[in-house]
C-alpha cells in the first residue's frame, strides 16, 4: 500500500451532507505523535481524498457514511480514526470492525497493527474457521480493537468473552455486502449488545438505497461523504468484452489469453464455487498454472493461497465474489469475468481490484449470447462503455 493519494483524486466529485472540512496533510489532523510515526512508517505521505474528509468527523465522534472508490484508502481511514480515539492504557475493546469476509477482517487487523506499531495496540481478528479457544484466550487477555466477521463476533459477545461495555465505535466495512440479507440479522444482534452511545461508521464502494434506509436505524445525523457513482472505480480501468457465443467456448478463449495474463497477475471471477473448482482443474489438466479460492475452502488453505498470490509466486487466481471485496494486492492489472456477476453491484468490486490507488487496469468480460442484456445493464448502471477487446491486449497492460 503505497502513497495514500492518487492522481485521480482531484477529479472525484464529492456530494456531502454539509460542508466537510478538508485536511490536506496528516499533520493538520491533530493526531497522536506515535500514530503519525506509524502512518509515515507505513509510507503514507499525503492523505487520500476520503482520508482528507472522513478522518476528522470520525475522530470528533460523528456518525459517518463514507463512500469511496475501491483502493482509495478506506481501511486506513477508519484504522487511523480508531487508533486516534482509543485509550491504550485501558485494555478493553473500544472499537469493533465488522467485515463480510474473513480475508478482509485479517487485512484490517494487519493495517491496524502496522499503523499502530508505536502505540502498543492490541488488535485481534475474530473470524469463523479459526480456533474458538484461541479467540477466547485473546479476548480474555483484552483487545483494544476487534476486527471480525459478524457470526463469530456475535458468538463471542453472547458467550461474554468479547466485553462490550467500553465499545465506543462500530465500523461496518463493505456495508452494502454486510447489510445484504445474509448479514443483516447478525449485525442487528451485535448492535443490540453495544452501549447506546456507540458511534457508527459505515464504509462502502456502493451505497444502494436499501443500505441508506437501514442506516437511519442506528445512525444519528450522520456526516455523508459520498463520491458520485459514475466516477467510482471505473476511471482508469479499460473495460472490454469478448463475444464467446456459447458457454463451452469460454475455456478455449481463456487458454488463448493465458500468456497475456501472466505478464503481471490476473484474477478470474466465476459465479459459483463449483465453477471455480471445475475451471482450475481443467486449466491444470491443460498444463496451465493457476491457483483458486472460494468460501467453502478451509481457512488455512485460503490463507496459503492468499499468501502465494501476494508474494507473486502464483500469478493467476480463480475465485468467486468472496474475493472481490477489499483485498489489496498491488500487482493486479487484469481481471477477467469468466462469468458476468449476477449482482451488478459486484461488478465494481470485481474490477475495482485492477486499478487500486489510481493505477491503470484492464477488465475483460466473457459474454455469451445470453449475457448481452446483462452487459448492457451493467453499462447503463455505471454510465460506462465496454468495448470489444482489441487484438493486441498486451499493449494495454
Swiss-Prot record:
PROSITE patterns assigned to the protein according to its UniProt record, in alphabetical order: HELICASE_ATP_BIND_1, HELICASE_CTER, Q_MOTIF
Record protein name field: ATP-dependent RNA helicase FAL1
Q: Does the keyword Nucleus apply?
A: yes
Stored InterPro entries: DEAD/DEAH_box_helicase_dom (IPR011545), Helicase_ATP-bd (IPR014001), Helicase_C-like (IPR001650), P-loop_NTPase (IPR027417), RNA_helicase_DEAD_Q_motif (IPR014014)
**Top EC class, one word:** hydrolase
Q: Which GO terms describe its biological process?
A: mRNA splicing, via spliceosome; rRNA processing
Residues binding ATP are: 68-75
GO MF entries = ATP binding; ATP hydrolysis activity; mRNA binding; RNA helicase activity
Instruction: Report the protein's function.
Output: ATP-dependent RNA helicase involved in 40S ribosomal subunit biogenesis. Required for the processing and cleavage of 35S pre-rRNA at sites A0, A1, and A2, leading to mature 18S rRNA.
CDD domains for this protein = DEADc_EIF4AIII_DDX48 (cd18045), SF2_C_DEAD (cd18787)
Classify the source by domain of life.
Eukaryota
Where along the sequence does the record place the motif called Q motif? 24-52
- Show where the Helicase C-terminal domain sits: 236-397
Q: Which cysteines are joined by disulfide bonds?
A: none
Keyword line: ATP-binding, Helicase, Hydrolase, Nucleotide-binding, Nucleus, Ribosome biogenesis, RNA-binding, rRNA processing
Q: Is RNA-binding tagged as a keyword?
A: yes
Q: Which GO terms describe its cellular component?
A: catalytic step 2 spliceosome; nucleolus
Q: What is known of its domains?
A: The Q motif is unique to and characteristic of the DEAD box family of RNA helicases and controls ATP binding and hydrolysis.
Native source organism of the sequence: Mycosarcoma maydis
The record places the motif (DEAD box) at: 173-176
Question: Which reaction(s) are listed as its catalytic activity?
Answer: ATP + H2O = ADP + phosphate + H(+)
EC numbers, comma separated:
3.6.4.13
Amino acid at each position: 500500500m503505497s502513497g495514500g493519494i492518487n492522481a485521480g483524486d482531484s477529479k472525484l466529485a464529492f456530494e456531502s451532507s454539509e460542508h466537510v472540512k478538508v485536511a490536506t496533510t496528516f499533520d493538520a489532523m491533530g493526531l497522536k505523535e506515535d500514530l503519525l510515526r506509524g502512518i509515515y512508517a507505513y509510507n503514507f505521505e499525503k492523505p487520500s481524498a476520503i482520508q482528507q474528509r472522513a478522518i476528522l468527523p470520525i475522530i470528533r465522534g460523528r456518525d459517518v457514511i463514507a463512500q469511496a472508490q475501491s483502493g482509495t484508502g478506506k481501511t486506513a481511514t477508519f484504522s487511523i480514526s480508531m487508533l486516534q480515539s482509543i485509550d491504550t492504557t485501558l485494555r478493553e475493546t473500544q472499537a469493533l470492525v465488522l467485515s463480510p469476509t474473513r480475508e478482509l477482517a485479517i487485512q484490517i487487523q494487519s493495517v491496524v497493527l502496522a499503523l499502530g506499531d508505536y502505540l502498543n495496540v492490541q488488535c485481534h481478528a475474530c473470524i469463523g474457521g479459526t480456533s474458538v479457544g484461541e479467540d477466547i484466550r485473546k479476548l480474555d487477555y483484552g483487545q483494544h480493537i476487534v476486527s471480525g466477521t459478524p457470526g463469530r463476533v456475535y458468538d463471542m459477545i453472547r458467550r461474554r468473552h468479547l466485553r462490550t461495555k467500553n465499545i465506543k465505535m462500530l465500523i461496518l466495512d463493505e456495508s452494502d455486502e454486510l447489510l445484504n440479507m445474509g448479514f443483516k440479522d447478525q449485525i442487528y444482534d451485535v448492535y443490540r449488545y453495544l452501549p447506546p452511545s456507540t458511534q457508527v461508521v459505515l464504509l462502502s464502494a456502493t451505497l444502494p438505497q436499501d443500505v441508506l434506509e437501514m442506516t437511519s436505524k442506528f445512525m444519528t445525523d450522520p456526516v455523508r461523504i459520498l463520491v458520485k457513482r459514475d466516477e467510482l472505480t471505473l476511471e482508469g480501468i479499460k473495460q472490454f468484452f469478448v463475444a464467446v457465443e456459447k458457454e463451452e467456448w469460454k475455456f478455449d478463449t481463456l487458454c488463448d489469453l493465458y500468456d497475456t495474463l501472466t505478464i503481471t497477475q490476473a484474477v478470474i471471477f466465476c459465479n459459483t464455487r463449483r465453477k471455480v473448482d471445475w475451471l482450475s482443474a481443467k486449466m491444470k489438466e491443460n498444463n496451465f498454472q493457476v491457483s483458486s479460492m472460494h468460501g467453502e475452502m478451509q481457512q488455512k488453505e485460503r490463507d496459503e493461497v492468499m499468501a502465494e498470490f501476494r508474494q507473486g509466486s502464483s500469478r493467476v487466481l480463480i475465485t468467486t465474489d468472496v474475493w472481490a471485496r477489499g483485498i489489496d494486492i498491488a500487482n493486479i492489472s487484469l481481471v477477467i469475468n469468466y462469468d458476468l456477476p449476477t449482482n451488478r453491484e459486484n461488478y465494481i468490486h470485481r474490477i475495482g481490484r485492477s486499478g487500486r490507488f489510481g493505477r491503470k487496469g484492464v477488465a475483460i468480460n466473457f459474454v455469451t449470447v445470453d449475457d448481452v442484456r446483462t452487459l448492457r445493464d451493467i453499462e447503463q448502471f455505471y454510465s460506462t462503455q465496454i468495448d470489444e477487446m482489441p487484438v493486441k491486449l498486451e499493449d494495454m497492460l
